[in-house]
Amino acid sequence: MPGQNLTRLEATKRSATVHTRSYDVVLDLTRGETVFGSTTTARFTAAPGSSTFIDLVAPTVHSITLNGLPLDPAEVYEDSRIALKELAADNELVVTADCAYMHTGEGLHRFTDPADGETYLYSQFEVPDSRRVFAVFEQPDLKASFTFTVTAPSSWTVLSNSPAPEPTPTETSDGSGDAHTFVFAPTEPMSSYVTAIVAGPYVGVTDEYVAEDGRTVPLGVYCRKSLVEHMDSAEILDLTKRGFSYYEDLFATPYAFTKYDQIFVPEFNAGAMENAGCVTHRDDYIFRSRPVEARVERRAVTILHE
């Protein structure tokens, strides 16, 4: 049994075998409280005739197709790995699975707000947990472009690394309610652990920053509905813009991504996470009462660090 840990030797061998190009990830967040639908199309090159594996942690794998040929999940999926043999020079792998919502801050975390019963989701992938949401070569040096398509209840906001597109109306998977589907633009090549999905009835305030190269960068600050009266968005956005200006001047490099959202999320198991263009912060940084100066300073340090 291979287990769920990746060794350095395995990572080195896999990097020498495959080169990742792109992932198309389709997620259905309307299937209930325990699992969500995940379909991944991974495109990659490989040494012809070679073998490797792709990572996935899922309670159910429905189907696996490699270069048009079906593979039996019972034969090729073990622990957190899907074995891939007799690879071609150019490969397309399609994996359809049910993945599990988490309550430990790994993968796609699900939280129900006791204040109003609303449900919130956010991802935390650093370092080995994007495999809990989609099939992926889970190591930072195998970068690729990611295209996310997300179906969620119609009352939800959905955020990712690329700017949020206009959603298409649809129905929930069981046809019992209204939903909408977001098709996000492909990202630049990046490591899987800095990709992100945030979904739920988050409430936000938006602004803009003019980057050093003249681009207008959209900014957003979001939190759950029950905390919005406490969110000092003006101060957070002002600090963010001053931080951008300082770092662009210091490093003589403009901001690299197309937008910059900051989402303050519940039950976060760290201070924050620098997902590309979609940063998550623990919502303890939304102060419910007048904070001491040290807490304000700590939040500022975290925002500028990310």
Predicted regions and their residues:
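Long, charged, glycine-rich C-terminal linkers/tails
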Residues: 256-266
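Short alpha-helix carrying the canonical HExxH Zn2+-binding catalytic motif
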Residues: 295-306
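Catalytic zinc-binding patch centered on the HExxH motif and its immediate surroundings
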Residues: 74, 233, 264-282, 289
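Acidic/His-enriched low-complexity segments
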Residues: 1-258, 284, 289, 301
